[in-house]
């Protein structure tokens, strides 16, 4: 898939060449995520069982509480990245549409490539900010306020895009 999207080139006997991603690719990937995730979080805000939302909130709060003074090792970074990805993937999965899920995974792949290229460094403060942003989305869903959930999600995307660029 990455090769068909022009993100990598496989060179015989030389290996894989990662094509340098640019700002346009990042913007396009986040725009695709927004198109897919906005209806997902709207749907969650209206229909996800309260206990499921409370469990999501509790997991985020636990990670936020642990992030203070956390030494971010490669293992911690992988765990947090997987946690972040699961939050977004689970929202899209809640729509029960495999086509949307595949498109969403592809957008995430683009963002991961850009983070690699930008030498994206995950810090304890970045983890805390991300968890706070996620909590704002989850709490809006708990309040059954889809507009607030979308507003919090859009703010999260704007900040996540800045973090991916190292700004």
PLM features: what roles do these ranges have?
Residues 1-2, 11-12, 27, 75-76, ...:
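Short, flexible segments with low predicted structural confidence
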